[in-house]
């Protein structure tokens, strides 16, 4: 007798296989040619204007500049939620991003429609990014949550 197992009488020649998928960690820069994008402090108005023209021509049929979903998600706040490289990779490499990037796949799951490849070049994608940066919402004061301890300043509310 060469077995040391329990007395069930059944033999097992199978090996234990793990069927769970390895969790893929999303690269915050996405997948594509853009690994590093230089962004200045201010807005390049010329670049933003060229980006606006492209957005008006190729993007507004599906995307709005607010936070509302049309076909695709609204653009509001995108530059706060995503890295510049991710945005540019999504614009220029949309098919690979939708197939392999977990963040892009989550958007596809939410919107249920694949973003079409618009054949946007790297320089044009940079213009779109600059336009989206220009549209970034400014932080606003919420005076309802501010407590003013000086009675002479209560007129502010």
Model-derived segments and spans:
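Axial heme c-ligation environment in periplasmic c-type cytochrome domains
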Residues: 6, 70-78, 95-124, 140-141
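Gly/Gly-Pro-rich "capping" loops immediately C-terminal to redox-active cysteine motifs
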Residues: 48, 52, 63-93
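Electrostatic cytochrome c docking/interface patches
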Residues: 16-54, 155-156
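Sec/Tat-exported extracytoplasmic proteins
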Residues: 58, 63-66, 79, 91-95, ...
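Sequence context of c-type cytochrome heme-c attachment sites
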Residues: 35, 64, 105-106
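C-terminal motif of bacterial Sec signal peptides marking the signal peptidase cleavage site
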Residues: 2-3
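Bacterial Sec signal peptide processing site at the extreme N-terminus
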Residues: 6-18
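C-terminal capping alpha-helices of c-type cytochrome domains
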Residues: 85-90, 113-150
């Amino acid at each position: 007798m060469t077995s040391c197992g329990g007395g069930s009488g059944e033999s097992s020649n199978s090996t234990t296989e793990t069927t769970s998928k390895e969790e893929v960690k999303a690269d915050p820069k996405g997948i594509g040619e853009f690994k590093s994008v230089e962004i200045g402090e201010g807005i390049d108005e010329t670049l933003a204007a060229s980006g606006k023209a492209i957005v008006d021509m190729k993007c507004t049929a599906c995307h709005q500049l607010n936070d509302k979903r049309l076909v695709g998600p609204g653009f509001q706040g995108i530059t706060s939620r995503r890295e510049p490289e991710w945005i540019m990779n999504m614009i220029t490499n949309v098919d690979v991003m939708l197939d392999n990037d977990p963040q892009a796949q989550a958007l596809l799951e939410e919107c249920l429609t694949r973003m079409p490849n618009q054949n946007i070049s790297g320089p044009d994608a940079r213009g779109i990014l600059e336009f989206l940066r220009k549209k970034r919402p400014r932080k606003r004061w919420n005076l309802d949550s501010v407590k003013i301890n000086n009675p002479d300043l209560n007129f502010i509310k």
